[in-house]
Amino acid sequence: MEELINQLIKDGYLRTPLIIKALRSVKRKDFITDDLKNEADINAPLPIGYGQTISQPLTVAFMLELLQPKPGEKILDIGAGSGWQTALLAYCVENPSAGGGRVIAVEFIPELAEFAKKNIAKYNFIEKGIVEVICGDGSRGLEKQAPFDKIIVAASATQEPEELKKQLKIGGRLVIPIKESIWLFIRKDEENFEKQEFPGFAFVPLING
């Protein structure tokens, strides 16, 4: 994985020291099935069962760089899957000196929610109270726990996510795939959002109940 991380840095996909440190510390091999451990360092999505995948490292790096997770933040992670991205976010938001920092991860498929919990537990993020994994429909966010500093979605929506946008704090960021593009939304004030589109990606569809 070190070689791949260095390549992503060289190619300009990875720039932020905290995100680079997270990718070096939270090992992808700890979030896949035993039969695929030898493929953990490959820059490709891998199956995790139930028609879902663990995203390729390049895509995860790209989305984390857009999101810019920081210590002490409260982040909603929709589509926990294997738990890898959730654990990377937890590494970034953990704030040992000042406390705070939470990642609330939502996974629709019960078996994957349990898989994510088991994998994340290897890093003690659940035990420390940094990560909570909820089994349920995250496609409309978690209004009762809003607002969030950041929201990230790991599966592709079909249209602009108005309900998720409303759950951001002012200045907050939402990173979400819509069809074959990754979109970044930054909340400027109550009504207005800055948005950017980055085309050329493929994702599994966002499941809603």
Give the label of every model feature segment:
Residues Q68-P96, G100-E194:
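Conserved nucleotide-cofactor-binding alpha/beta core module
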